[in-house]
Amino acid sequence: MQAPYFPIIYVRGYAMTEGERDQTASDPFCGFNVGSTVYRAAVDKNAPPKRFIFESPVLRLGSDFGYSDVYEHGTDIMDADWQPRSGNAGIAARSVVVYRYYDAGSTLFGDGKASPIETYARGLDTLILRVRDLVCKQEGAEADPPGGAVTPENFRCYLVAHSMGGLISRYYIQNLMPVTGGLRAAHQLVILGTPNAGSPCANIFSIPMAAELRTDV
């Protein structure tokens, strides 16, 4: 495994309602497969839209950099019956992994209730350790060339997080990664639209998850 070809783990943003969590649980990539045909920001707000086609992060990572997803026969790597692709021992370093933390909070696969950020961060820790183990199996001591072997000590991944997903990732890095065997597993964190200083809108909603984003506490 050579940088920058580390596994990419996508952590999606906030889904407030039960219906939104169900919709998220129904999407294999939780929005990471959504593209665009226009620039969504411009210096001049009155300027006409500019056409620019971006296929989606998932498609671009596959077509330009050789990444692939880890779903096999309708299962995810966190499912008990997941099996690697034929001829493989685990997953490649160039893998796109989606952290499906809202599955348990949907009515489709769980109790329909959201959980605290700390709970989601612990789940992210578990997922990263699972990815580490599978990459080590695929590109470990028997890797070709041997010098490219991946071990638990040198394993790294990228975290790409949107909105509240950035808060989950930060909690993992700051509180869990150093003490749960993750070492320096997160090589880089990319956050998109994360309310690092809280969100004024959180004061509008009287739900536990919104309280974690308030700016006055």
How does the language model describe each region?
Residues 2-6, 92-94, 153-155:
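A short, charged/proline- and glycine-enriched loop
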Residues 5, 10, 16-57, 62-63, ...:
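Helical cap/lid subdomain of alpha/beta-hydrolase-fold lipid enzymes
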Residues 7-11, 95-100, 158-159, 188-191:
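Structural recognition of the beta-strand scaffold that forms the well-ordered cores
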Residues 52-70, 78-87:
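Short amphipathic alpha-helix adjacent to the substrate-entry channel of hydrolases
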Residues 73-89, 98, 137-140:
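Long, low-complexity, polar/charged, intrinsically disordered or flexibly structured peripheral segments
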Residues 98-115:
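Cap/lid segment of the alpha/beta-hydrolase catalytic domain
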Residues 141-162:
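Alpha/beta-hydrolase fold nucleophile elbow
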Residues 160-161, 165, 169, 193:
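Gly/Ala-rich beta-loop-alpha elbow adjacent to hydrolase catalytic centers
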